């Protein structure tokens, strides 16, 4: 019976080769487009190492800072470490809270008297390794004592280790990062660039650089750090947001003439991916609309090709 179906199909294809070719190519392109959309969505929101807990993550990257009596005066951007620590680190509801530099930075790494290698560096705190799940090939992440001391230790990816030393067995060795000496405490498997908030090739303590105290604007409220919150469950999201508001209000009691605007943050992972600037709302509806239109269009195109 199955052989008969195949014979009938081949017979129909031979009757009109041009229309059959158009139908097959159109259907294939439609399926390919749907696969691209699904893969894009999966890369945007589906958990994968080291962002293994995307579904339980809340993200705070930008804030607004303004006079209460003059809303026309406003600063927008990332906050300082001082602000992030006061407003988020004392939270009781989450499983973990990490503060990192807002963006990875390109630096030059080298062995003493060796060739320089350009690499992506992210500055993080000790809780970073609780929020993001890295595959350590050797060694370990730096701990709270290391972070509090501002020690110059680093976790590096396997590919950078091989570029610098010719081997991945480098725990305990020292290298130069923008001319500052760092000791390697751990080596991890290379991270995909699709892991937008965890990606780097070298991770160092935020406290080992001036980013720890860097700020701009009035009173050191604004700076260059982001906050990533790991909830115990998605059900805890409302409680975490309420606690964030309470800590923000307590912090701003010291600055009675100003407001710190969260603009509906912290965001879920998908919403954060649609927030492109500090002072504009995330384009969530537009993103969802685009995905739906693309799916409907490709579905219609496939139907037309088959007909």
What are these regions (language model features)?
Residues 4-5, 19, 39, 43, ...:
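Short, conserved clusters of charged catalytic residues that mark active-site
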Residues 5-14:
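A short amphipathic helical element positioned immediately N-terminal to and/or at the very start
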Residues 15-44:
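Short, strongly hydrophobic transmembrane alpha-helices
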Residues 37-108, 115, 222-226, 234:
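Membrane-proximal extracellular/periplasmic loop immediately following the first transmembrane helix
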Residues 63-77, 86, 98-127, 141-153, ...:
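Short acidic/polar micro-motifs at solvent-exposed secondary-structure junctions
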Residues 122-142, 152-284:
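Mid-to-C-terminal secondary-structure elements
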Residues 282-296:
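N-terminal membrane-entry
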Residues 297-305:
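Conserved small/polar residues in nucleotide/adenosyl-binding loops
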